[in-house]
Amino acid sequence: MTAADGMVIDASVVLGWLLESDPDPHASQAMEALDERFALVPVLWHFEVANGLRNAVRAGIHPPETISAFADRLELLDIRTDSVTPQLRRLGNEAVLCGLTAYDVSYLLLARDRGLPLATFDGELAATARSTGVDLAFEIN
């Protein structure tokens, strides 16, 4: 598995692409890259995306049937769920060390352990990735 083959993509990028009527160009670029590359995500990603979709429905931004439509769009992409879950000790220690949530650390560790770039709109996660030698799929402003 090489960086040229794939990337770790967090829920912020996917939700920015799915939910926005005019998606951020970085989100569109990352998702278009999945035509030729794969995305690797932690199990947590599925919960975060589902919750983001639920929040959009609950806020009246999208009707309930869009959840299935969005899921159908995502199923067309090569999004792979990592089968290795970091141990509680490692997640907790890294979260304290980095000053991030354990949720964000799961993406950071996945990118670091697999040698893949990270796609995120989370500024703190991006800064920590950069400072710990994890490449970013794109730079955010």
State where each predicted segment sits.
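Acidic, PIN/NYN-like endoribonuclease modules and their adjacent C-terminal/linker elements
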Residues: 1-6, 108-141
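Short, well-structured N-terminal submotif of metal-dependent ribonuclease cores
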Residues: 1-44, 56-68, 132
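Short beta-strand scaffold positions
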Residues: 9, 41, 102-105, 120
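Alpha-helix capping/helix-boundary segments
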Residues: 13, 45, 86-87, 107, ...
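Acidic catalytic patch
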Residues: 43-46, 67-98
